[in-house]
Curated annotation (Swiss-Prot):
SUPFAM superfamilies: Trypsin-like serine proteases
Major location (coarse): secreted
Organism lineage: Eukaryota, Sar, Stramenopiles, Oomycota, Peronosporales
Assembly: Forms an apoplastic complex with host endoglucanases in tomato leaves during P.infestans infection.
Positions of disulphide bridges: 54-70, 177-189, 199-230
SMART domains per UniProt: Tryp_SPc
Protein name, per record: Glucanase inhibitor protein 1
Glycosylation: residue positions: 87, 102, 107, 157, 185
GO cellular component: extracellular region
InterPro entries according to UniProt: Peptidase_S1, Peptidase_S1_PA, Peptidase_S1_PA_chymotrypsin, Peptidase_S1A, Trypsin_dom
Induction section of the entry: Expressed during infection and the expression levels increase with disease progression.
Described function: Secreted effector that suppresses host plant glucan elicitor-mediated defense responses. Targets host endoglucanases and inhibits the endoglucanase-mediated release of elicitor-active glucan oligosaccharides from P.infestans cell walls.
Cellular localization per UniProt: Secreted
Gene it is expressed from: GIP1
Domain Peptidase S1: 27-254
């Protein structure tokens, strides 16, 4: 478990919440994602075949969106796109990272605008996930979304999952979340159902709105950022709200949202 050193300011507002503040790195209470689906889900690695230490999402053929926190753990050297597994090279693509760029408004002390873009050495053959509308119309409090990653499947003292996992979590409005955490408009909260959460082992995991039968209609709503404890009843996790970063993403990737 990594205690979040950048959230000291946020901790002042957490008197009502028990537990320590941890980077969101676990898929708790979920199930295995079918092989060959959610291929935009990306593992971030130090070596081509090593364990993913963070997650992200393919948002253009040559760019992966993750959290700024993930660029601070250790330098992202490779991404694994379209793979079902936490490590190895038996499926998907392993592509070298040539540069990493944090959001221009990122504030590590408050985890505000917790975004980073990784530029890849070559284009991925997999389809990028759709980005949300910048007017925030794709997010409605009370809707159900899915978060996916390779983090621990139990808490505490869990072990990493070898296979991509996902779990359904409910979106909160920021007013309710602000009663528990210090959040701004670059964040969105989701979760709160007992034992169903993102937690220890996979910061940057995709929070996705499923609109149709297939992955082509999925929309990237958020990226797993931080929280307090894992799977506690009535306590959500905090995600980076992707709709607030569309202009910056477009400026870096040079790809216009269709």
């Amino acid at each position: 478990m990594r205690v979040v050193p950048t959230l000291a300011a946020a901790s002042l507002a957490l008197g009502a919440v028990a537990g320590e503040h941890v980077e969101r790195q676990l898929i708790l209470g979920g199930g295995e994602v079918p092989i060959g689906t959610k291929t935009y889900a990306t593992g971030i690695r130090s070596t081509a075949d090593g364990n993913a230490f963070c997650a992200g999402a393919l948002v253009s053929p040559t760019h992966v969106l993750t959290t700024a926190a993930c660029t601070g753990f250790e330098p992202p050297k490779f991404v694994a796109v379209g793979t079902h597994y936490i490590n190895g090279t038996k499926d998907g693509e392993q592509i070298k990272v040539v540069s990493a760029q944090n959001h221009t408004l990122n504030n590590a002390s408050s985890a505000s605008y917790d975004f980073a873009l990784l530029t890849l050495e070559k284009p991925s053959k997999f389809s990028p996930i759709k980005l949300p509308n910048p007017d925030d119309s794709d997010i409605v409090a009370g809707m159900w979304t899915k978060v996916m990653g390779w983090g621990d499947t139990s808490y505490p003292n869990g072990t990493r999952s070898n296979e991509l996992q996902s779990v359904g979590v409910e979106v909160w409005n920021n007013e309710d979340c602000a009663r528990l955490f210090v959040v701004d408009n670059s964040s969105v909260c989701a979760g709160g159902a007992p034992g169903r959460d993102a937690c220890v082992g996979d910061t940057g995991a995709s929070l996705v709105k499923e609109k149709g039968q297939g992955d082509a209609d999925d929309i990237l709503i958020g990226l797993s950022s931080w929280g307090s404890g894992c799977g506690d009843p009535g306590i959500p996790s905090v995600y980076s709200r992707v709709s607030t970063a569309i202009e910056w993403i477009t400026s870096v990737t040079k790809v216009q949202q269709v």
